[in-house]
């Protein structure tokens, strides 16, 4: 009960301070927000919370409004107005915002305000629920270590995503389902002293539900497709143990479900909508099914944002690498720590997932986004918490790194919150 009170108090105190920073922040540098508001709710007065419509949140809210105000195009989903808006969760998060906004939203004089406020409240709830999902996941991973669970949840509240979690970004939905999926899988899988795994038949349901959770997370944020590494790991373990039936009925079913939903969202549906007109994407297709071998998400990222191998490695992007450096370092150190100094077979797949994310973000993407999209991975939070517990006396080596990272967070969270409210980089 004491832990519940402390974490709840910290959570709402941090959020209150952040919203006060947004309130007192000066006007926005960019004109995207006033132009967006002028188009979709003209003659409405400017409000302080319009500052939350910064960067990608403009597109998330627009896609949500599109889902409410337009007729469903394919029976159950409304398509984005422009192709670059497919980047911003046009189905899962947009449909969630549609539900939050309500069917009568199109008749309101200020639909953006209504959607913005409700989506922001929804993200607050998702973040708060995720704090406790992570607490439960930590206790399952490190049994009876309540201090570690408490510190991990505390660090998750003080996330480097900072201001992004105040606005209608799609990250909270993904990390909520990611943590829930990890917890369900951890409840279903037993690890033995020989490095093998055991999957009891009565655990088939929670294991399969983990696949549904990961599918929702990946459909919402494509980087979460890396969670499929859990099922690859389990298949290899079960095949090595010659447990063929369970290999098929547990990880193969859960993983196939996840892969199928991801393929439908990012390959099949865009090919139906854009091919053959979008020749630059459609012409590179698989010969036997006539679907492009490159996901539409990757194509749009490359075409509009110049994502690709080393494309971001230019001198003018050095500041963005500096913004990302603390998380790049701490994520890498966490994989080393849980591979050699504190090896745990149960979190080995998460080590692989973290390393894969680091490689993708460092060499193929806009590197500064690591500060928010790494929020679905708890590995570095466990590393930080464990070292904070074990540190006695003067911090040295890894402990010095942890000390510097926590102090960076204390500086970064208010700074990034104000920058976000002013529509200033980093995005």
From Swiss-Prot:
GO biological process: GPI anchor biosynthetic process
Designated name of the protein: GPI mannosyltransferase 2
UniProt keyword annotation of 4Fe-4S present: no
Segments traversing the membrane: 7-27, 119-139, 164-184, 197-217, 247-267, 318-338, 350-370, 404-424
Cellular component terms per the entry's GO annotation: endoplasmic reticulum membrane; glycosylphosphatidylinositol-mannosyltransferase II complex; mannosyltransferase complex
InterPro entries in UniProt: PIG-V/Gpi18
Its membrane topology: Multi-pass membrane protein
Organism: Eremothecium gossypii (strain ATCC 10895 / CBS 109.51 / FGSC 9923 / NRRL Y-1056) (Yeast)
Stated family: Belongs to the PIGV family.
